[in-house]
Amino acid sequence: MTNSPITEPSPRQESVLRYPVLGSRRPSNYFWATAVSIGGLGFFLAGLSSYLHRNLLPIGNPIDLVFIPQGIAIGFYGVAALLLATYLWLAIAWDVGGGFNEFNKETGFVRIFRWGFPGKNRQIEVSCPISDVQAVKIVIKEGLNPKRSLYLKIKGRGEVPLTRVGAPLPLAELETQGATIASFLGVPVEGL
């Protein structure tokens, strides 16, 4: 899933521009949560098998492992992996970091919304009048750890990020999105 607009300005609906932001429900997070779950369960069952002297795994023979130190170490790694997998699955279920950027000329406000972890600040929302938006800033850093981000420069608030955390957006999509937002709001683009 990309940050392509859900609704582009059209003759009927040229007053609202809305972009979804992909949070923790990225395909890579599903892959890692599944891999860590399977590996953690395997390690935990191998450690438990060495303690109980009963084979709990469909493949391999962990009964031959000596419980101390091998079985206990494998069991510990299995528990640690299962805890990490639980964290990943909960972050996916809660869609941490997901949300949207909405630019609404009808109400005269920009609304940036993200989901956080459960608790007091589960819903993270930044809202400001369109008149406070000074520019759309594009940051591009290439190299070993590339960074391609869009920021909204807001009077009195500094730079507010518009793009998701994780894999950088393709350059063409980043430039198109930045230009579309700047044109829609009537502000300049910085950083190109």
Curated annotation (Swiss-Prot):
TM ranges: 30-52, 72-94
Superkingdom of origin: Bacteria
Membrane topology (UniProt): Multi-pass membrane protein
GO biological process, one term: photosynthesis
Subcellular location as annotated: Cellular thylakoid membrane
Entry keyword set: Membrane, Photosynthesis, Thylakoid, Transmembrane, Transmembrane helix
Gene Ontology cellular-component annotations: photosystem I; plasma membrane-derived thylakoid membrane
Role played: Seems to be required for the assembly of the photosystem I complex.
Sequence similarity: Belongs to the Ycf4 family.
Protein name per UniProt: Photosystem I assembly protein Ycf4
Protein species of origin: Thermosynechococcus vestitus (strain NIES-2133 / IAM M-273 / BP-1)
Gene name tied to this protein: ycf4
